[in-house]
Regions:
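Radical SAM/AdoMet-radical enzyme domain recognition
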Residues: 71-88, 96-212
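Short, small/polar residue-rich loop motifs at catalytic or cofactor-binding pockets
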Residues: 264-269
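C-terminal accessory region of radical SAM enzymes
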Residues: 230-259, 286-346
């Protein structure tokens, strides 16, 4: 890594792990809990690819988050929450332009924040990579779907070669980079195969990967693309095997629920809110229903703190606490089924309707009125529970002499079985 990248990585780790957060203490006095840990912001929907099953969905006239509003959001989150980490998504973030400025101008304007950027990688030329290396407080997570053919089947012909060019440019500039991987029913077994792990992490130098199990939202959503319950368990087993054997940093937003005590949505402590290009604020990137709009909040003289008072978000946080966040083991439900959307549709949809959360796009509106969508996810939840509940009970909990469930220490948990 470049010297700047190394310095910023060390400073970020110190802030997140060792340093006290005075802003967080004030927040805790007011709300009874620590503040959200980060934001996910998609400042623009503009993208040069048309990936199959993109989560963005269809909009007639998407906007762009102005540079000034984008900047204000980051300043407020830093000042009021003590936030030191921000995630950027899209669209394609490196195509963002506003008031003659781009994403890297925003990164430069906030040297005290560390930026994780989800990108398709096609815009990372040598000049862009060199500037990222000079800034030091940014790391791109580049989207791949596995091998060459699998990646191009979803993302388009020629994309894999551009990703390889991006890797080369980032290595030359000393920029730490990782991967963003979407697991579907078709590529799930390939995604963390020995061949794929060796290629990306050992040969190309990727330092981490974030795994997203396909969510049936956005463009041409398709429930049949979701990984099966057994594939989901196999992926969890394989993920922990790769972590232990290859020492690779991997996180799966569903299968890693045990490491973060469940769902992170709706501004939970150490969790996040999602803000898109229209200023709409949703609980999660994968819950396309807005409980607020940042432009309206600012118009009414508010700040980002007002998000904590939105009833839709409050109700989700209440559910998180009742489900397993900061609960005793006897009251903790299955944290490898943590998602309020895909794993607990019977919880989410009534809340959306009760609080009149606004669908972000045509597909989100359609899902609310499509009985097959609800029934399909509900059936999926039940099928997953049959496979994953016994794993939760056997591998993460045990019963003591008084018949009380207690959580197994990590060193006592059975090693995951692997089939790869």
């Amino acid at each position: 890594m470049s010297k700047r990248a190394t310095r910023h990585a060390i400073e970020f780790a110190h802030k997140r792990i060792l340093a006290k957060n005075p802003n967080g203490e004030a927040f805790k006095e007011r709300y009874g809990d620590s503040p959200p840990g980060f934001l996910v912001i998609s400042p623009s929907r503009t993208c040069n690819l048309h990936c199959k099953g993109c989560y963005d969905g269809t909009e007639e006239a998407p906007s762009i988050l102005s540079f000034s509003t984008f900047d204000r959001i980051l300043n407020e989150a830093s000042d009021l929450w003590g936030m030191s980490f921000v995630v950027i998504s899209g669209g394609e973030p490196f195509m963002y332009k506003s008031d003659g400025k781009n994403l890297l101008d925003m990164v430069e304007a906030h040297p005290d924040l560390y930026f994780l950027v989800y990108t398709n990688g096609t815009q990372i030329d040598r000049e862009t990579a060199e500037r990222m290396g000079e800034l030091g407080n940014i790391t791109p997570a580049i989207s791949v779907e596995g091998k060459v053919k699998t990646t191009e089947d979803r993302r388009g012909e020629g994309v894999f070669g551009k990703v390889m060019n991006a890797f080369e440019n980032l290595r030359a500039a000393g920029v730490p980079f990782g991967l963003s991987m979407t697991a579907t029913r078709h590529n799930c077994d390939e995604l963390l195969s020995d061949e794929v792990v060796k290629f990306y992490f050992e040969e190309q130098g990727a330092m981490y990967a974030w795994i997203f199990q396909y969510m049936p939202i956005g463009t041409n959503y398709d429930l049949s693309l979701m990984i099966t319950p057994q594939q989901r368990l196999n992926l969890q087993r394989r993920m922990w095997h790769v972590i232990e054997e290859k020492k690779v940093f991997l996180m799966d937003f569903w299968n890693s629920g045990t490491t973060v005590h469940g769902c992170l949505a709706a501004g939970r402590q150490a969790g996040y809110f999602y803000i898109n290009w229209n200023g709409d604020v949703t609980p999660c990137v994968f819950v396309p229903y807005a409980g607020a709009n940042i432009h309206e909040i600012y118009k009414n003289g508010g700040t980002i703190m007002d998000l904590m008072e939105v009833d839709f978000f409050k109700e989700i946080r209440n559910w998180q606490h009742s489900y397993g966040y900061k609960t005793k083991p006897a009251q903790t439900k299955n944290l490898i089924m943590p998602c309020v959307h895909r794993d607990h549709i019977d919880v989410l949809f009534p809340l959306i309707k009760e609080h009149k959360a606004k669908p972000l796009n045509q597909e989100a509106a359609q899902a609310l009125t499509d009985p097959k969508y609800y029934e399909g996810l509900h059936s999926y939840d039940e099928a997953c529970a049959k496979v994953l509940d016994p794993v939760w009970e056997k591998e993460y909990l045990k019963v003591n002499g008084q018949g009380t469930r207690i959580e197994l220490p990590a060193e006592e948990r059975p090693l995951p079985e692997t089939s790869h």
